Structures are given as structure tokens and as C-alpha cells.
Amino acid sequence: MKLQKLPVRLAVAATVGFLSIATNGPVHCPVRGAEPEAKPVPFEAGFGERDITPPAGLPMWGYGARHDMLSQGALDPLFAKAVVIHAGDDKLAIVGLDMGRGPTQPMMEKIRRALSEKAKIAHVMISGSHTHHGPVLELTDRKGFGKGKFDKAIAYTNRLPDLIVEAILDADRNAKPARVGINSRVDLNLNRNRQSKRPIKATDPMLAMMRFDDASTGKPIAVVVNFAAHPVMTNERILKYSADYPGFMKKHVESQLDTHCVFMQGASGDMSVNAGQYNGPQKFGEHLGDLVIELAKAAKTQVPPHPAIKGRVDHFLFHSRTDFSNPLVTALYSRAFFPELVRNFVAEFQDGVPVELNTILLNGDTALVGGSGEFFSNHSNRLKERAYVPHALFFGYCNGHSMYFPTIEAASEGGYGADAQVSPAEVGAGEQVMNRALVNLYTMLGKLRPSDDAPAAEHPRTASTSRP
């Protein structure tokens, strides 16, 4: 982003005895106390969406140079698109937003509470696409923090969590027996490293697709796309809302496959689009969509042999490299952005940099990891290399926004996204988050004991919630 950033080993086996006595034939003797054969766990999936396009007249998110300039309408609509997965009684919601960031912490609290009370959905991953043509979400109903001057924006952000919940509840109600298939490519050159000064620059080339089909008809229910690159192809001087290239990709996939498409942004902290001949958000989005369609058509879906959802949420509070209590610092930020936005930002970061990590193990073979910020691509690459599962996807801007997380070597290089101004968390914070995700996954896989997965003693401000 451009400156706006300121602003579950014990395996329990029921053994059924079979005793063959050499008389007139076999005699079947069930072992006393044996449990009955377990019923298959149902696997279901459903889709839901809501139009979340704001009204005109809200300050726009993404470029500090806009300051508090107000939007003048929309180039294309913004959506919240959700897939809800059932594995027996356990439920996971995967939500893609055409927003610059994930929901704020108060929004997430409201969303989680509603989903728990109304649908018993315990696992939630909501990622912003990181479009730089969405509304500012951080303003609050306090004098000097948005009240009075930006009441229209506050009214919208008060309504947004309800719209997201509605989309998720629709997906939950629409859930039906499903098959799932995952396909990906890593031989593409669709993104480029915009930060590194090294001759060989890191990228996360993976384009991944999860396809959910109706188990009885084979008709696609939805596809979930995971790709990493900043959606900044729309001219920053255009003060209108736009989903940028992810919006055109989704629309193209939906029209060609007659299904629904959810976009989940990856670790794009240092990733920009490598457009080549596909200049502009529509051309690039449709080209990306063509590649997604190829992956979807080639994917083989099946009912998972052992449907299961295991999840854990970790919260970190990292030391800040920037002193937000210094009035000179806040004054400089206010000049770069606008005062009301900066006051909300400082209030959130005054005790340190808060980070949320979501780790999901789906069906025992798919890792879904979500981090609340702009993680550099090598964080995702290294997680995928070290997680010995068939499929591993990383979702950025997930369930919040904690600014940039450069790798240690990137922080040593400096530059935008790596310097303290927009990546205030202590150096190495990203690595700590990814290590935590890896321990979570191996614990869920039964390869580490739960007693081994307590947060490290040197990070006493790390808290976690497990939802096996």
C-alpha cells in the first residue's frame, strides 16, 4: 500500500475382535465394550455474497497523497463473497472482500459473535483484496476520530460487518454435500518484487484454486482463488471505488464457469503485478481468470475421505519500531495522511503492534494460514516449503491489518514496506508469526504434542485460542 498503511497424539482406536474357531465354521465374537463403527462425517460447502459498495462521499483508502479527499462514486461494484465449509458440526468461513484491508478488530469481534450465536461458525478467515480504490475503514464515532466530519463513513463501517455476516450466513444456509479439488501453478511470471535490491529477487509465483462441486450433480458451487500481487492497476487519481484486477478476474471466471468466485489475496507486501502485454486491470484480471479457468477445469474433485476442520487463532503484540507516543511523529503522519485517520491508527498501535494469525488444517491435507497484514512473499514461500502437507495457501490482510511484515533480510535492505514508518513491528515479527503457524500445523497433524506448542516464553504477550 502507498503510505495509507500508516494509516489439535493420542490415537484412540476401537478394535473389533474376530475369533475363528476351527469347528464347524467361524464364530464371530465382538470384543466387549467395542464402540460401533463411526458414521462418515459429512462434507458440505455453500456460497453467499453481498454488494458492499459504499455510497459516494467517503474518504478513500490506499494512497496517502489523497489525504481525506472524498470518493466520487464507483467504477465497478465491491463485493463480500463467502464460502462456508462444513465438516460434520465444524464450520469454516472463507471470505474475500473488495477492500483495502481486513475488517478492524471491533468489526471482527462483532462478526465472530454473530456467527457463533446464529450459525455456530467458529473458524473465520476474512481477507481484503487490498484494492487501493476502496473506502477508509478505520474512522470511529469519537470527536477528533471521525465523528462530525466523517459521519457518512462511520455509518457505512457500522453497517459493513452486518453485510459480511449476511453473506456468510447465506453461504451457511446454502451448504450442500460437496466435493473439493485443489490445483495450482508455480511456473508463472505474473508478479514481480517491487522492494528488493538484490539481483535475484524473491516472488511467490503460485496461483492456487480450490474448487467446490455439488456432490450429486458435479456442478461447481464456487472456486476460491489465491494469488499475490498489489491491486494498484487503477489510476490513483480516479476517486471512484473499484475492485481493480481481482474484480475483473472474478467476473470473468464466474461468467465462463457459471459459478461463483472468491479472491483471497496472498503475501503481496512486496509483490506488484507483472502485467506484460496485459496492461490495465481488466486485461490482466481476465488473463488471470483464464489461467484460473484452466486450473479449475483440470482439477479433480472428490469427497474428502476424512473431512475435518482444525483451527487455532493466535494473537501477538509486538514491540513497535516507531514511537507513536511522540507528538512530532504523529504530526508527521497526520500531514502524510489526515489527522482523524492517524488518531485511530495511533490508538490501535499505542501499546505495540497487534497481529492476528489464523491457522486451519482442512481435511488433514490442506493448510490455510491467514495473517493480519502485508507479509512479504518469502514468508509465504518458506511456510509452504516447511509445511509437509499436499496443499498450503497463505491469505494476507486476514481478519485485520497490522501494516507491513518484511523478512529480516528485507528489513536490512530498507525501502518502502521495510522501513519502520510503514512496518512498525519489531524486526523478525513476520518470522515469529510464520513459525507459530508451522508449529500449529504440525500439532494439528499429530506430529507435535500439544504440550510442545505453547507460545515461547520470550514472547509473553502472545495469546492463543485453539478450536480443534
Please tell me what each predicted stretch does.
Residues M1-V27:
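Bacterial N-terminal signal peptides that target proteins for export
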Residues V8-L10, R32, G134-V136:
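Alpha-helical and His/Cys-centered functional microenvironments
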Residues F18-K39, S466-P468:
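Bacterial Sec-dependent signal peptides at the C-terminal "C-region" and cleavage site
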Residues E35-H260, M264-M271, Q277-E286, A296, ...:
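Conserved beta-alpha junction segments in alpha/beta enzyme cores
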Residues G289:
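Charged, flexible cofactor/metal-binding loops and thiol motifs
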